[in-house]
Every structure is written in structure tokens, then in C-alpha cells.
Amino acid sequence: MIIAVTSSFFAPVSTAIKTEPTVDAAEFSSTQSAVPAARLARLRHGINLSHWFAQSADYSRVHLESHTTAEDIDLIRKIGFDHVRLTLEPAPLFNPQDPAKLNAEYLEYLDNALDLILAQGLAVIVDIHPTDEFKLRLNSNGQIEAFTKFWRALAQHLSARDPDHLFLEVINEPMVQDGYRWLGIQGKLISAIRSGAPQHTIIASGHRWSGIPELLFLLPYADRNIIYNFHFYEPFAFTHQGATWAGPNVSFYKNVPYPSSPESISRIVDTVQDESARRNLLRYGEERWNAARIDREIGVAAAWAAKYQVPLTCNEFGTYRSFAPAADRVVWIRDMRTALEKYRIGWAMWEYAGGFAVVNKKNGHATPDAEVVKALGLVVKK
């Protein structure tokens, strides 16, 4: 069933946590959040809209006007999602010679997409979601300055939209390896966004892949209109089995079960010929991943948020469906959603359509995966 929206959903959880490293800088603070409760309530259960304005080799007019349609947005609402996270590749908007000057034609396509989403009563996170190549440029101070100018201009453009329904996410998984450096970079970007959009809520994350370890390294910024965020794809051996882009081990895996145990893994380990991948899979079995383990992991993130009295979301989690046992994938999604809601953490699943999808899409028509929708605690409206 659909759980009623209440402002207490994001209430702090009283849980102890070890002290993180400190940074002596005025831009950091431990003051309570000033994010309006109504905004938090709109980010309870969402879905990622990927491969539309990001992760595509084609940003042509035909692609942008046909990849995701009004029918898709209507279905997202009917499934019971309250918001979407719109992934946005900055490169088509970005002018290296004049970063503050946005591509007007492409900006119009983005505006049309936002109009489509907001017209359905959904909230939307505009997530800057660059390629790895673009993100690696953040190792250069000059590129940081250019990106800062870009974000200020984009934020100013988006500031005309209702701040109760549109949220601005600094960047997806920045890949900056140095956590201290990322604290400074993100602080600079937050200042730029805030100067362009004084009223809008900003979403900030940790360095590298923005997981829980990176979240724990973060110190809240002095800007109190920020929601903090993390991604969760553990255990990776299960959620990314068969994914050729995700590292040297998981590409060898198929039919990896969840929950895990030495006994369940023993039934498939002989199908893996690569020695390193075999050892990694055996370790996954020994780790005994299940609902209780996921609950403990999410509890650590919740404790960090409680310590600093800041709101927290998880706007990426999911399982690659090509090789995972379908029933086990449903169990993992249910366990994740249950843990997040236990700790009053708003969520957005990865993704609407694609390898991790909540729908099956054929010939432009999408059909919800009934078991996944149920695992998310949602009910499709007629």
C-alpha cells in the first residue's frame, strides 16, 4: 500500500555514531536543518529518469522528444512515486569558452522536460550527472572554476521554478578521491548554486562514489537548506552481477543468490572460472548478506544524520536485472526499501527503464513490474 505522507518521515533518528574527522573551516556547521518539512515529504519514494538527458550517445531532438514521454511520466505518478531524479549530462549545455553562457536550444529541451514532470504534480531533482571524463576534470582548479560558473548560471535559470518542487543536486558520484578536497570543492559549488537560486534546496553527497563510507566523511555545511544523500548498491556481487562495466569480478557472475550464505554460494561457485572472482564470491557467501545486514548498514547512515540533525536521502539503489534471480532481486529491493523507511530516509530507486528498471518497456510502451512495485511498497493506480 501507499504510506501516508507525514512531515515526521525525515525526523532525526537517535543513534550513536563514532566521531568523524574534523575540518577547521567556517563553512561547516552542526546546526539543525532549515529544509521545509513539506519539501522533505515530497522526496519519500522516487525513481531515477536515466538515459534521457544523461548516459546517452545521442542528445538529438528526436531522442530528447521521444525517449521519455508524457505517458511515461503519467505512469510514474500512477505507480505511486512522488518525485523523479532527472539525470542531466552537463556537456551539451556547457560552453568551455564561456561557462556562464548555457546552450539556449538545449536548455529549452530541459525546460520542456521539467514542465512535463511538474505538470503531473511530481517533484524533480535536477541531478548533474556527467561522464567520468567530465568528472575527472575536477582535479584541475581551472575546471572547478568553470564548473562553478556553469552551476551559478544554471541555478539562476532554474530559480524561477517553485523551490518546493524542484531540487538541485550538486553532482552525481564526483569520483574525487581526496575527501578533504571534495569538501572544499562541494562547498564552492554550493555557494555558486545558492547565489543563483537563493530559495531552492540543494542535495549534497560524499566524494568518490557517494556511498555510506563517503557520507561518514562529510561534515555538514553552514548552509542549512541542504539535504544530504548517499547511494547504496551492496552487496555488489549481487546487485551488479554480470555487469561488464562494473569491475573485474562481477562480470563473471550469473544467478548469484540473495540472501547469501556459504551454502547458497557453494551451489554456483564452480560456474565461475576466474580465481579472483571465485574468492570474491566465496567471501560474499561468508558475509551472509540479508535484511538484518542491510538494516545495520542503513542504520549507520541514519546515525550520521541524527548526529548532525540533518535530513538524509538515498537517491540511488537497485539491482541489475539481466542476470540476478528475479525473485531474489525483489527480496533485495524490499529489504532496502524497508530499511530506508524504518530510518525515515527518503529514497529514489535506480531506475525507471533500463538494466535496473521498475518497468518493462517495449515499442515505447511501459508496463510496471508488479513484483518490484510491490517490493517498493507501492500500488499502481488505475
PLM region descriptions:
Residues E27, L282-G285, A303, K374-K382:
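Aromatic- and carboxylate-lined catalytic core of secreted/periplasmic carbohydrate-active enzymes
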Residues V23, V35, E145-R288, D295, ...:
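Active-site region of glycoside hydrolase catalytic domains
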Residues V124-V126, L312, W347:
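Hydrophobic beta-strand scaffold residues
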Residues P21, S322-K382:
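Aromatic-rich peripheral "rim/lid" segments of glycoside hydrolase catalytic domains that contact
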Residues I17-A38:
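Mature N-terminal, pre-catalytic/accessory segment of carbohydrate-active enzymes
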Residues S30, S66-A70, D295-I298, V330-I333:
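Structural motif corresponding to alpha-helix initiation and N-cap regions
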Residues M1-S8:
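Bacterial N-terminal signal peptides
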Residues E27-S29, L40-T201, G206-L215, N225, ...:
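Active-site mouth of glycoside hydrolases
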